[in-house]
């Protein structure tokens, strides 16, 4: 199966509202398979130092809604890696970026995400779990943090199949 990966790098960190609008627009595209948001973490609590354990009340750590699915924003969006099933909608993706990021952005096509199980996948899920992921949903490959629960780090937004 031919997949294309696109990196979108806005020239500024995005607020939660802009991230929500952007994600909803790109999920309207038919060829979008997977979106990974990368950026500065927005922790719930301070993890080190004299204030360790105190809550962090960051204004941008919010629950956004992407196609009706609530997604907890745990990073300040600074980069998006988008997997497309083909390159037919690259121009539409570029138009969405021009509309949403008047301050500028970079759009690159390349290889940014894992497509084979990693050692971390085997540690987290075990050999049987990796086999199941390979058979069921390959979008989850390479999407693990060995120290986190999957429910905290990955949200699946299902695409609506439009009947024609």
Swiss-Prot record:
Task: Name the Gene Ontology biological process terms.
Answer: methanogenesis
* UniProt-listed Pfam families: MCR_D (PF02505)
InterPro entries xrefs: Me_CoM_Rdtase_D
Keyword set, alphabetical order: Methanogenesis
For the keyword DNA-binding, the answer is no
* Subunit and interaction comment: MCR is composed of three subunits: alpha, beta, and gamma. The function of proteins C and D is not known.
NCBIfam families in the cross-refs = met_CoM_red_D
Indicate what this protein is called per its UniProt record: Methyl-coenzyme M reductase I operon protein D
Organism lineage: Archaea, Methanobacteriati, Methanobacteriota, Methanomada group, Methanococci
Q: Which gene encodes it?
A: mcrD
């Amino acid at each position: 199966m031919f997949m294309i990966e696109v990196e979108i790098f806005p020239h500024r960190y995005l607020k939660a509202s802009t991230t929500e609008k952007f994600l909803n627009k790109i999920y309207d595209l038919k060829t979008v398979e997977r979106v990974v948001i990368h950026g500065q973490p927005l922790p719930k609590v301070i993890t080190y130092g004299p204030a360790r354990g105190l809550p962090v009340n960051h204004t941008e750590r919010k629950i956004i809604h992407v196609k009706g699915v609530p997604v907890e924003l745990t990073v300040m969006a600074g980069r998006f890696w988008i997997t497309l099933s083909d390159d037919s909608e690259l121009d539409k993706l570029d138009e969405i970026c021009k509309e949403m990021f008047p301050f500028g952005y970079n759009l690159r096509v390349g290889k940014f995400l894992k497509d084979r199980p990693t050692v971390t996948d085997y540690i987290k899920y075990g050999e049987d779990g990796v086999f199941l992921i390979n058979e069921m949903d390959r979008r989850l490959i390479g999407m693990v943090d060995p120290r986190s629960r999957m429910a905290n780090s990955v949200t699946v937004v299902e695409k609506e199949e439009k009947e024609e």
